[in-house]
Structure formats: structure tokens, C-alpha cells
């Protein structure tokens, strides 16, 4: 697994990127491509359950799929245990090589 960059270069003083927030059942590859074409700078996948990724569920991996043209791209995962989150994070980083991981700890 590669090292994580200490900061995200597209954020910083004087930078205001258009960030596409993840939306369950909406933020798929096609939707993200449309948003990128309309000016989105940074995008993230809809959230995916860590256990589904660990079990190699095809639908879960489809949900975290993205194209090179959609970078910078993040993958959002959620889970019930730190161990499953860590394992899923390693799998996603090794297989998909996202620019960042977004850990969902629950919506308000």
C-alpha cells in the first residue's frame, strides 16, 4: 500500500474547489462524469460497506469504480468495526488507487 499524502493539494489558501459530495444511489460513474464535465473539481464515490468489499461483492466494487478522468477521486467506506474498515481501506487503496479515502462514521 502506498503512503498517504500529508495533505490534499487541491485544498489550501485561496483555493475553492467544487466538491461533489457522495449521495447514496446517485453518485455512480456516469453521474460523476456529467458533474466533472460541468466543472466538479474533486469527487467521491457513494458510501460502500466495508464488509461487502472484503467479501468481494461485485456490486460493491462497481460502486467504487471510477475513471482516470474523474481524478482527484475519493472512495467513501463505512463499517461496523475498525478491523473491517482497515481491511477494506487496504483493499480499496491497493485495487482502485484513489486519491483519498473518505471514512463515513455516520450521518447527522
Task: Name every feature range the model reports, one short phrase each.
Residues 2-8, 23-99:
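Glycine-rich, positively charged N-terminal anion/phosphate-binding segment
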Residues 15-18:
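Extreme N-terminal starter segment of soluble prokaryotic enzymes
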Residues 97-107:
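Short, flexible active-site-proximal loops enriched in glycine and acidic residues
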